[in-house]
Regions:
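Conserved alpha/beta catalytic core and glycan-binding cleft of carbohydrate-active enzymes
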Residues: 24-226
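Short, intrinsically disordered, charge-balanced linker/junction segments flanking boundaries
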Residues: 222-237
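Active-site groove signature of glycoside hydrolases
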Residues: 1-14
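Glycan-recognition and catalytic cores of secretory/periplasmic carbohydrate-active enzymes
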Residues: 14-21
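Alpha-helix N-cap/helix-initiation motif
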Residues: 8, 16, 156-159
Length: 237
């Protein structure tokens, strides 16, 4: 399986311009042809925040043909239910129905208003026509942990029992489960955002930008690890 990062940022106007296939649909068809020649399954998994099942709808039916896509809404609902955090994009998931809805229909925002984005977001998923295995569910990822100010895993905020309950919910769901590295044994080490830019100005800009970003959420500059510092990398390996 090959994961395609942030496919919502791929700009391809081919379908609108001349009726051709979108790049992702082309990749899907090429991968299917290769899988047939090799006589083994090959999968493309998309990271997309569009909340649109067109991503995993077959190309023949007008979709993009991905084997599966990440389901961030499931993560968000689980995270809020377990930790009680409701800042930033977690705000809408404080809704008591969020967990039930995401565990049955993958997307919480399926045409509803997203306060974080300031607009209506997503489209409904019909479980009768879109299989649950098309959605990848998880309690932690490199993004959701690494993009926290100190890279703390969810286990730093909840009890082992709560973490086990959260794991049970996504492992036993209708979705394809994904276990984050170290989660299987309850690793307590952080996964901090680290970089190795050789350009001093670029490195400084990243470090300062990260501190400024988290300052808006109440973190002081001294609390946010410097991405360019080797100790930040060492703390995560």
């Amino acid at each position: 399986a090959l994961r395609l990062d942030a496919v919502h940022e791929l700009k391809d106007d081919t379908p609108d311009r001349d009726g051709g296939l979108h790049l992702l649909a082309e990749l899907s068809e090429a991968t299917a042809a290769l899988a047939e020649r090799l006589e083994r399954p090959l999968d493309l998994i998309a990271e997309s925040d569009l909340n649109d099942a067109t991503m995993v709808t077959p190309v023949a039916d007008g979709g993009l043909g991905m084997s599966a896509q990440w389901a961030d809404d499931v993560h968000h609902a689980l995270h809020v239910a377990l930790t009680g955090e409701t800042q930033g994009y977690y705000a809408d998931f404080a809704d008591p129905e969020a967990l039930t809805k995401t565990l049955t229909r993958a997307f919480f925002h399926d045409g509803s208003f997203s306060t974080f984005r300031g607009e209506e977001w997503g489209a409904p998923v019909d479980p009768a026509t879109v299989s649950g295995h098309r959605f990848v569910a998880y309690l932690q990822t490199h993004d959701q942990v690494g993009n926290r100010a100190t890279g703390d895993r969810i286990g730093a905020s909840i009890t082992p029992g709560q973490q086990a309950a959260g794991a049970a919910l996504y492992l036993l769901s209708a979705f394809t489960p994904m276990v984050f590295m170290g989660e299987e044994w309850g690793a307590s080490t952080p996964w901090q955002y680290f970089t190795d830019f050789r350009d001093p100005e670029m490195g400084r800009a990243v470090s300062e930008g990260r501190r400024a970003e988290f300052a808006e959420h109440g973190w002081t500059s001294g609390e946010v690890p410097d991405p360019q510092d080797e100790s930040t990398r060492d703390a995560s390996v």
